[in-house]
Amino acid sequence: MGSRQVAVYFAWSRPDEENAQLGTLENRFTALFESRRIQWPRQEHLADPAKFDQGIAGFLDHILLANFAMFADFASSLTGNSVRIAQRQTRAAHTALSSQWLVGVDTLIIISWDSNRSKQQATPEELQAVRALLDTPGSTVFICPHHDVGDVRELSADEGFRNREAEFHHHGDPAIPSQQRFGMFGRSLLDGLGLPIRNRFGLRPAKAADGGPAPLKIDPSVDRFGLLSGVTTFNLHPHLPHFEMLGESASKFDVLARQPIDLNAPPHPFVERGRDDFDALLQTRQNTFPGQLLISDTTLWTSAAEGFESLQQFWRNVLQLPVR
């Protein structure tokens, strides 16, 4: 039996993200100097501006991307294959999610941490490449849009302000502005596959009595590949998305895991509508594709928000799926 070849694709445009105006709070990443100020003194090892870019580029390189390094090392160690990693757009090059880039890949993780402001959209050729991978038996594709905080398009100005204020107080993270919307590239792929999903909100997950993540609500009857075998929790990233299935998606996906919401946090409109958990991991039902498609948050592949032992078990389960 062979071992898996993993590829991780960051669907952002680095120039678009890095060039966001710091004087505008909404719809941009935190700059490194802002993160250092909010997290002081935890990140003082990154304080030297001669060594570390203190802007958004520094945050992306030394905080966000660094949090994915442990998964890449873990995957390389377990499979014996180096993880293939690309960013969609850097200052040096554009790397499409093409059939050429995917040669030999059987496990693809698409990190859709792209700001909606940058309007990243999958091209027809990229959609064809992902569909071809899903048409390969034994292949595994994760599409991972991050949170969508402050979507007030259907609200009046006053209602929108109140809604953004409620969302902000619910997640409680001062590093996150009142509107921070991600995931357009991932959603465009799902729309193109005829499986529309929307990443909604930024929900604060519940803690267990020991301070770790509260246990997941897992449906083992639909976990036909055992991806959650031995997995009890995900993480405590303070603003996680609910994955809403639209149209035919509701008949094409199973919800493998729901994550409890922190009901001690200030109320969120989603909670006030009756939910005490959110859909955290979706998987296509049998016969949707010869391969399998899953939807998760980007942070399931990072090491920065507690629950690490259980996350490692999840990674192990994914990486040890049989290769056909």
Residue ranges and their predicted role:
Residues 1-324:
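Short, surface-exposed patches at the edges or C-terminal ends of soluble domains, predominantly
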